[in-house]
């Protein structure tokens, strides 16, 4: 594989999971800076908590401070679900509040992209395109990446639309069902973006707990095609790769797998070696 022309940042989606204590983090039972700890090992983390509630700017300022030891670190962040899943409830005040949350990240040059994630039920239509245009305009000042999960969007015409709007297409790995978005190496807009969700077919649409759909550990063989795609995208764009199979630190294992497969040094939290043994022994 040729040397990538652009930076590749690899990291997990989120950092605050109770099942990561004793697996990713050392047992601590009290105050412990999980974000600052992970920033020693990875150059990006996707912030997922804003999907559920818009954080105040005090939170984003704190997060910027906590990654200060890693000069190469950049966040990506999910957008509030009111803009993508519950649009009938969103207000102009929500737009302002989310911008206020973003500004400390952007002003510190720590914002790689906003992730606009839509569900599989969101399909390509004139109404959907107008909805996207409005959302893109509301957050025109920030780098954006769009994740859609319905195959009706996966075509050259839509890629050209995103490129014209300056928005990245998010390439995803997920369980493949009828009309699912397939694996790809498209690069539109300001950055390349890849999200690996796992392949837990049984729990993807039907699960008692939300973590169940992300309970999946990729084999290194399963990741090989993605290594090629990451390399291809990074020839064109600065690239973000996010592992979202977070249950029991599996996202960290696979992030390290990708680093190693790309010929880069893989830094692994020591606790992870104790839990996964030989699975991360050569990382």
Model regions and ranges:
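Residues lining hydrophobic/aromatic ligand-binding pockets adjacent to catalytic sites
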Residues: 1-283
């Amino acid at each position: 594989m040729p040397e990538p022309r652009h930076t590749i940042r690899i990291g997990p989606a989120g950092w605050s999971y109770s099942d990561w204590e004793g697996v990713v983090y050392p047992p601590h039972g009290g105050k412990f800076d999980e974000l600052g700890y992970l920033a020693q090992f990875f150059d990006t983390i996707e912030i997922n908590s804003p999907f559920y509630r818009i954080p105040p700017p005090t939170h984003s300022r704190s997060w910027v401070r906590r990654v200060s030891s890693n000069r190469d670190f950049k966040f990506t962040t999910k957008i509030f679900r009111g803009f993508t899943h519950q649009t009938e409830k969103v207000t102009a005040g929500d737009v302002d509040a989310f911008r206020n949350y973003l500004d400390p990240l952007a002003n510190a040059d720590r914002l790689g992209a906003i992730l606009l994630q839509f569900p599989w039920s969101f399909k390509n239509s004139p109404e959907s395109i107008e909805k996207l245009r409005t959302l893109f305009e509301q957050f025109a000042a920030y780098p954006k990446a769009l994740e859609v999960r319905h195959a009706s969007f996966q075509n050259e015409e839509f890629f050209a639309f995103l490129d014209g709007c300056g928005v990245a297409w998010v390439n995803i790995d997920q369980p493949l069902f009828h009309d699912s978005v397939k694996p790809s190496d498209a690069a539109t807009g300001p950055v390349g973006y890849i999200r690996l969700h796992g392949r837990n077919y049984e729990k993807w649409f039907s699960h008692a707990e939300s973590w169940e759909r992300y309970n999946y550990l990729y084999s290194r063989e399963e990741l090989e095609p993605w290594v090629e795609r990451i390399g291809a995208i990074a020839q064109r764009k600065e690239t973000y790769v996010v592992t979202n199979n977070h249950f029991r630190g599996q996202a960290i294992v696979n992030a390290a797998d990708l680093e190693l497969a790309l010929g880069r040094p893989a830094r692994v939290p020591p606790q992870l070696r104790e839990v996964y043994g030989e699975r991360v022994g050569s990382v």
